[in-house]
Amino acid sequence: MSLSILIAGASFIGLLTYYIWIWSFWIRKGVKGPRGFPFFGVIHEFQDYENPGLLKLGEWTKEYGPIYGITEGVEKTLIVSNPEFVHEVFVKQFDNFYGRKTNPIQGDPNKNKRAHLVSAQGHRWKRLRTLSSPTFSNKNLRKIMSTVEETVVELMRHLDDASAKGKAVDLLDYYQEFTLDIIGRIAMGQTESLMFRNPMLPKVKGIFKDGRKLPFLVSGIFPIAGTMFREFFMRFPSIQPAFDIMSTVEKALNKRLEQRAADEKAGIEPSGEPQDFIDLFLDARANVDFFEEESALGFAKTEIAKVDKQLTFDEIIGQLFVFLLAGYDTTALSLSYSSYLLARHPEIQKKLQEEVDRECPNPEVTFDQISKLKYMECVVKEALRMYPLASIVHNRKCMKETNVLGVQIEKGTNVQVDTWTLHYDPKVWGEDANEFRPERWESGDELFYAKGGYLPFGMGPRICIGMRLAMMEKKMLLTHILKKYTFETSTQTEIPLKLVGSATTAPRSVMLKLTPRHSN
């Protein structure tokens, strides 16, 4: 027998042993859970667009309880729906759980030059968070209010045309056009509305529909393949939607830099006011005091540090990329679910319309007016409770071995929240947890966050940085629609909604009628 055959045989046995060792991790720990298959674990369960894996978690929770273990290729993941456990991981022990689960195709969060707020961790995440936070301040949100208003007016024109036909329309399609148009104008240098003629829309939709299949599956099982996929897609971005979008972002950034250089050469002074997120990031300076983490002290231990470094070119691309995707999909889905629930509950919709009529009596809607729409905020929060659309990112990676409520968690283990189960837990929400009741939020949401029971935008220090922008967009659009129309179900409305998705959980369609309010 030749030496090469012996080496090949030994390598195969070693590889097989390694994967069986990972696959049997939770068995050896005595932790219950679905086992799946060696090499795969249950990673394939999260690749079926028609049957979202995030909903599968709820089925497993019923079978195995609020804490159980799965393997996803080479990743070991603890699934939890115990609110106290969630609060412990996301808030109290953040210094032990500051990382997030990633796929190798996304790049090493410590080395990837284009790491963004969702993927970055440790010192780099804190720095990016510090530099990006001013972008979503009330001051800057007020600056982009006119852009949001213009985009709302443009969408209303399309909705008016659709409503005039007297037929139900798929509002999900309209909301996706709306959110991509807004994010294109405030984050991509887009100077005019491209609604219903945006060449980027099919690419963005592709990321959420097909972008997580084979490459992510293979990379999750064989991490080295993820590096190879990434290098290939970086070289040929048009092949894969996410890399194609990132290439588009890079072109937009280069165009703005060229414009700035040309203006400077021509002696044109800057206006002093940033046009959009690109300008805000290009001008970003972190010459401010912030709490820098020292690993020797623990991530949450704090020391004042000075940071005087500008965002790099690649970091700006990363931030714009993730803001584009998050700003497009989650806001469109939230609007869709809110509209559907209002159509199903006419009495709640009427109460909301009364608030809109009272607080926003004029055709033009202002920032201060939408800030007073408290019941609308309750409606949106309740819709996000019943349809936690982005729960795939509700996870943390253990960065230092620790014990959480009696469960020993090794470094490198992921903790994924079964958000759908958590958001319907009667111990948190009461016996009416299955009911759409916005009034539960009228006393504030601090109680539900403190219980660890509500995380549509995440929880703790890594909570979604753009949630105020998202709420502003939703309030603005719903205000304009509800001033003029009433949402109604039709024979084409799927009841209950058929849910699909992989990266997010989306309705297949939201077919509703827009009935004019004749009393106006």
Swiss-Prot record:
Its EC number is 1.14.-.-. Its cofactor is heme. CDD domains: CYP3A-like (cd11055). It comes from the Eukaryota. Keywords: Heme, Iron, Metal-binding, Monooxygenase, Oxidoreductase. Pfam families: p450. One of its GO terms (molecular function) is heme binding. Heme binds at residue 464. Belongs to the cytochrome P450 family. Cytochromes P450 are a group of heme-thiolate monooxygenases. They oxidize a variety of structurally unrelated compounds, including steroids, fatty acids, and xenobiotics. This is Putative cytochrome P450 CYP13A5. The lineage of its organism: Eukaryota, Metazoa, Ecdysozoa, Nematoda, Chromadorea. The gene is cyp-13A5.
